[in-house]
Amino acid sequence: MMNQTVKVKKKKKTITLGVVHIRASFNNTIVTFTDIQGNTISSASAGGNGFKGARKATPYAAQVTIDRASEKAKEYGLKTISIRIGGPGAQRESAMRALFGQNFVVTSIVDVSSIAHNGVRPPKRRRV
């Protein structure tokens, strides 16, 4: 008789409270779902979802990115989130609206955009 090996499916741990980090730059949108300690649950970016070039920085691309990342996070049982949003991009509002449409309980919204205190010199003016 042959020895049969039994494959045991690895059980995903359930996480009920998490943090959503949204980075909306001028060129892309990156969304990361983490637990309270900062361990990554799921992440997605507009470039990774098939958007290329200038379409990565659109509000629609941010909405699709939130949808993909939240589907993966819901597999872990995530229900309550805290939102940390940063960056100067125009897709910040649509990313937040997409999160509200995912039926999460939102406890707080924090803007973590870095503000330069006269740091680096800006690029030269564009002449057309």
Swiss-Prot record:
A Gene Ontology BP annotation from the UniProt entry: translation
Q: Name one Pfam family in it.
A: Ribosomal_S11
What are this entry's molecular-function GO terms? rRNA binding; structural constituent of ribosome
SUPFAM superfamilies for the chain = Translational machinery components
Q: What top-level branch of life does the organism fall under? A: Bacteria
Instruction: List the GO cellular component terms.
Output: ribonucleoprotein complex; ribosome
Q: Which UniProt keywords apply?
A: Ribonucleoprotein, Ribosomal protein, RNA-binding, rRNA-binding
- Gene3D superfamilies with a match to the protein in the record: Ribosomal protein S11
Q: What does this protein do?
A: Located on the platform of the 30S subunit, it bridges several disparate RNA helices of the 16S rRNA. Forms part of the Shine-Dalgarno cleft in the 70S ribosome.
How it assembles, according to the record, is: Part of the 30S ribosomal subunit. Interacts with proteins S7 and S18. Binds to IF-3.
The UniProt similarity line reads:
Belongs to the universal ribosomal protein uS11 family.
What is the recorded name of this protein? Small ribosomal subunit protein uS11
Per the UniProt record, the source organism is: Rickettsia massiliae (strain Mtu5)
